[in-house]
């Protein structure tokens, strides 16, 4: 079958025919691939920059792709022929308690597999076989934006985790019982920053997006339709602090030099949460004893945010459907481009490089 393969830790990517018998199979349901999503993780693997990416045992290549929508070929165990489905990409170690109850996002051994990334073949191939417990149904009404359910699942889990952490505060809701008075700063306005903004606004929190430039057309649409605030941070964050004050939640969605944290930690308010989502690959954070004392004395929390599981995929499906009503203009702009699997030149280009203003590029299997 045709597949997109990589050979981590080496850079490079190929579209080639491979022997199906040499590829990982995960169950009995045959799924024909319709769409794959491309994200920063894929590009880091393609460009040889993701050090945690490893080959499946005994193999010299890895099928790329952890974002996919496919169609069920034969009815089986609650799934009907023709159903659209999305696979959950992280699979448990089979040892620790969290993995045994379907939560490998909290794997205690670190021996989990991640399709298309770590130890498991991914879904950038013509078809694959899977287990029902790792499949989420995608309504045909959101087929146009459904590929976003995978990255959105990670954001669903992240916000769920933040809200769970904030239960440590006796009262974190506002005087009307909502979260409408809580302020969030989302640093970084790429695909992840946009999804964080949309979901925080859906929950009712007040949001500021920040980047070192003016917003793109897509970002401007999100800002206007969700009534989000925007701050150009090219000259630092002093003006934001003076005009808005401190924030209840700060999200680092930049994936940029980690030095950015030194600029935003002073913006975090009492009892606040700093959520780290982006994977920085350079820099260091200057933390003196006074900053650490303040973190302790004012009950601040710093938390790593990663990987949604099946419940979060299901929540993502619901929210994507709701955004087509709540934020219809933004929803229509979330898929930046669709590239045919048969257009190899363009395909290899988008697998290597992010396009300006990109939210999500998807591959169409024809």
From Swiss-Prot:
Zn(2+) 2 binds at residues 93, 96, 99, 107. Pfam families: ADH_N, Glu_dehyd_C. Optimum temperature is 77 degrees Celsius. At 37 degrees Celsius, shows about 20% activity as compared with the maximal value. Its EC number is 1.1.1.47, 1.1.1.359, 1.1.1.120, 1.1.1.48. Substrate binds at residues 41, 89, 114, 150, 154, 307. Catalyzes the NAD(P)(+)-dependent oxidation of D-glucose to D-gluconate via gluconolactone. Displays broad substrate specificity since it is able to catalyze the oxidation of a number of alternative aldose sugars, such as D-galactose, D-xylose and L-arabinose, to the corresponding glyconate. Can utilize both NAD(+) and NADP(+) as electron acceptor. Physiologically, seems to be involved in the degradation of both glucose and galactose through a non-phosphorylative variant of the Entner-Doudoroff pathway. Belongs to the zinc-containing alcohol dehydrogenase family. Glucose 1-dehydrogenase subfamily. Homotetramer. This is Glucose 1-dehydrogenase. It comes from Saccharolobus solfataricus (Sulfolobus solfataricus). The gene is gdh.
């Amino acid at each position: 079958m045709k597949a997109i393969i990589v050979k981590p830790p080496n850079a490079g990517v190929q579209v080639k025919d491979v022997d199906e018998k040499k590829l990982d199979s995960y169950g009995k349901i045959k799924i024909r691939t319709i769409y794959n999503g491309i994200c920063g993780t894929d590009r880091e693997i393609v460009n040889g920059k993701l050090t945690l990416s490893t080959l499946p045992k005994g193999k010299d290549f890895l099928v790329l792709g952890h974002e996919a929508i496919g169609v069920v070929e034969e009815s089986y165990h609650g799934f009907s022929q023709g159903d659209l489905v999305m696979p959950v990409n992280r699979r448990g170690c089979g040892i620790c308690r969290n993995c045994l109850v379907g939560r490998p996002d909290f794997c205690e051994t670190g021996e989990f597999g991640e399709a298309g990334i770590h130890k498991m073949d991914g879904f950038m191939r013509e078809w694959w076989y899977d287990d029902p417990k790792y499949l989420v149904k995608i309504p045909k009404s959101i087929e146009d934006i459904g590929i976003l359910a995978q990255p959105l699942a990670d954001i669903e889990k992240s916000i769920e985790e933040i809200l769970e952490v904030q239960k440590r505060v006796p009262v974190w809701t506002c005087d009307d019982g909502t979260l409408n008075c809580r302020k969030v700063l989302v640093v970084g306005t790429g695909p992840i920053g946009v999804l964080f903004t949309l979901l925080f606004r859906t929950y009712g929190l007040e949001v500021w997006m920040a980047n070192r430039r003016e917003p793109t057309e897509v970002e401007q649409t999100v800002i206007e339709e969700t009534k989000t605030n925007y701050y150009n941070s090219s000259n630092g964050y002093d003006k934001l602090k003076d005009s808005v004050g401190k924030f209840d939640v700060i999200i680092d969605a930049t994936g940029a030099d980690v030095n950015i944290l030194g600029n935003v930690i002073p913006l975090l308010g009492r009892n606040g949460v700093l959520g780290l989502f982006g994977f920085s690959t350079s820099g260091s954070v200057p933390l003196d004893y006074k900053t650490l004392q303040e973190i302790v004395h004012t009950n601040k929390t710093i938390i790593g945010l990663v990987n949604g599981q099946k419940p979060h995929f299901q929540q993502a499906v619901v929210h994507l459907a709701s955004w087509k009503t709540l934020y219809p203009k933004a929803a229509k702009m979330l898929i930046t481009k669709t590239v045919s699997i048969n257009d190899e030149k363009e395909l290899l280009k988008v697998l290597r490089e992010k396009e300006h203003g990109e939210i999500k590029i998807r591959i169409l299997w024809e």
